Structure formats: structure tokens, C-alpha cells
Amino acid sequence: MVKCSLIRALMVIAGLIGAAAFTTPANALVTLDLRKGNVQPMPIAVTDFQGDLGAQVSQVIAADLQRSGLFAPINKTAFIEKISNPDAAPRFEDWKVINAQALVTGRVTKEADGRLRAEFRLWDPFAGQQMTGQQFYTQPENWRRVAHIIADAIYKQITGEEGYFDTRVVFVSESGTKQQRKRQLAIMDQDGFNVRMLTDGSDLVLTPRFSPSRQEVTYMSFANQQPRVYLLQLETGQREVVGNFPGMTFSPRFSPDGQKVIMSLQQDANSNIYTMDLRSRTTTRLTSTAAIDTSPSYSPDGARVSFESDRGGKPQIYVMNADGSGQTRISFGDGSYSTPVWSPRGDLIAFTKQAGGKFSIGVMKPDGSGERILTTGFHNEGPTWAPNGRVLMFFRQAAGAGGPQLYSIDLTGYNEQLVKTPSYGSDPAWSPLME
């Protein structure tokens, strides 16, 4: 049974501490040009927090910021000032000497009731002032989550955009040989830590997807040798079949309001796209072709759906209205296109492209213009968006490798990183921000 310790156990009380929180970012902002793929990361000094868990918390914060590609944490050996009192103003000149455009100080203390209190301050050395400060309370076992929350706060203060570090990823954990591969649903923090198995591996599972509430996951399972779409309650571990259809159902995904599941239903050699209302259990057919229509994904406003179809001879990306009208092809490059997924911002659609014997992860605008390839390899597939729409995660099977691995990459295409998992991993799906 799935426990909810990471879902509900964290009680966060955030508030400003000390000086006023300025709404303007640091004087040296992150420079991001997605058209050219150029990023000038901001040098930032993340000091060891005071307290027993302080060093570990600051290490997670620095790792989060570095992985974003927008920040360059300064090596601690370059620090001139040793912070002994995180409440006091630092010696700004010492931090300007090492070009720290931003400085993070803080402490972690244990309260009388057993909770941890984590507090931080973000400073602008060149302006000589505090930018923001907050404090959070949680249970000791959730110290990593507090570190992610602090990293999100720093990211937002400096970039003006929401962070994505306090999020989770559901994926398919793969172990064993290719001939006897065991596949389990698993969930983890976005940095690969705190992995938990959600299924026992007795049945093949594919394409898990989070609900907007983060409390449910929909996925495809071959339980009882019958491919079906299931709903899994993360808190209780209870699962149920989504509809009792005569054919195979697959490629499920929630609507933005969480009221529907959109999926593909196979009928003979064809498959079409349907929605099911989770309250009334009524279904609506959106496509009707003698082809394979699959991989549907809603736009963030729920008004449109992108999907994959081979109705033109090979898989391509199409867009239609949420009621099935206005079906329009948007991909016209060389090769075939699959697994389209709409950005949370609504401005881009990510996809898998197969051409020249290789698989690429790319993005295009919803009208098909502005196609950009972010990474190419032997087999890259299954992009999923971070909730801020700036980073993608996908899985890669290298030539001759034992199994697939998860990777992340930002929209510049120049910050590709391995997401380490205990075993092989595929089919990642990013959660919305935690609450």
C-alpha cells in the first residue's frame, strides 16, 4: 500500500524573516536566449547552513540550482568569509571579489516538538542588501523536500519564474535481463532520490501519468493478460480499471481539470482517441479513422489536443479541438513524429522524431512552426515537461546498453543530464508542483 508521508506529512509555514523581501531580482540576471541556445549561468554562492543537517540541505540546494543550467554555484574553497551568523549581513566586499552575483545563507534547527525549522536568506552582494528570506517547518525525514522548496524560492526570486525542484516523477523502473525484464511503476523526487515502488512487477506497466492533483496516476497495465488503462490512488494504493472496453486501451492522460482521462482504444487494426468522464463514466469518441491515432495530450487550457496519427502513411503530429473537430497536421519535417506532449505554458509541443536511423527529442510551436531538435541519439523517447515548461525529461536507450536511462534537458539543448535511478528507467512523467 502506498503511504502518503511525502504528500501530506510536510507542513510548511513560510514567512519573511529580517529585512524586507525585494521584488526585483539580483542586478546580474540570468541571460537566456532559447533561439541561439546560449545561457550565461549566474555565479551564486551557497554557503553551508548552520545546524546538524545544514551542510546536506545546502548541498541539495546547490545541486538543484546547478542542474537548472541557469546558475553556477561557486566552489566553497573560493569563499573568503566564513558565515557564522546567517542572520547578520555578510561582508559584501568579500563576495564581490569572487563575483558572487547572489549569496545564500541559512540554518537548520530542531524545535522542541521534534520538527525541523529551515530558514534561509538570499543576498545581493553588489547591491549590498537582502533580496528575500523565508523559513519552513517540517518533519526531519522530509529535509530534502525543504531543500527543494528553498531552491524553488531562490529560482523564482532571481528569474521571476516558478521553479520545478519540489516535484516528483513517476516512471517505469526496469530491472533484470532483456529476456526477463521486470517493470514496476515507481515514484521519485525530480533529482532521482527517494525512489519508491508502486507496483510489484508481476504485470507489465507502461506510460504512467500524474493527475493535476498529484494524488492519482493513470497508466497502462497488462494485468490478467488484458491491456487496460488503470487509475492508481497514491495515498491508498487502490487501483481501478478505466472503462471496460472490448479492445486494448493505452496512452492515457488526464485532462487539465482532472475530470477526464483521454486515451486510445484499439479496434481491430485501428485505434482511435476517446475521453472518459471520471464521474459519470461516459465516453466520447474524438477521432474516427482507419489508422492508428494515439498519444493524446491536452493543451493546458483544455481547449485543444495534440496526438499522433499514421493516417498519412507514417506517424505525424496532429492538433484538434477538445471536441474532436478541426483535426490538422502540424509536423512536416523529414522522418516520423510521435509522443507529442503540450508544454504547461501552452507555447510549445515536445515530441519524439525518428529520422536517419536515430531518435531525437524536439519542440515545435502548436502551429508546427519553429521546430527545434534538442538532442539526438540511438533511441531517445517519451518527453515530459517540468511544471514550469523550461525543462524536459525523457528516456534513452544507448546502442548495446543493458537498459534505458532517464535524462533531463532544458530548452536550450545545452544542459543534458543523467537522472540517476537505482535501476533502468523509462516512460517518465513529471508532476505538478507540490503543495
Swiss-Prot record:
Offer a single GO CC term for the protein: periplasmic space
Location in the cell: Periplasm
Where's it mainly located? periplasm
Give a yes or no for keyword Nuclease in this entry: no
The record's section on InterPro entries has: 6-blade_b-propeller_TolB-like, PD40, Tol-Pal_TolB, TolB_N
- Entry keyword set: Cell cycle, Cell division, Periplasm, Signal
**Known partners and oligomeric status:** The Tol-Pal system is composed of five core proteins: the inner membrane proteins TolA, TolQ and TolR, the periplasmic protein TolB and the outer membrane protein Pal. They form a network linking the inner and outer membranes and the peptidoglycan layer.
User: Family assignment?
Assistant: Belongs to the TolB family.
Name of the protein: Tol-Pal system protein TolB
Q: Which organism is it from?
A: Rhizobium leguminosarum bv. trifolii (strain WSM2304)
Query: What lineage does UniProt assign to this protein's organism?
Result: Bacteria, Pseudomonadati, Pseudomonadota, Alphaproteobacteria, Hyphomicrobiales
Name of the gene? tolB
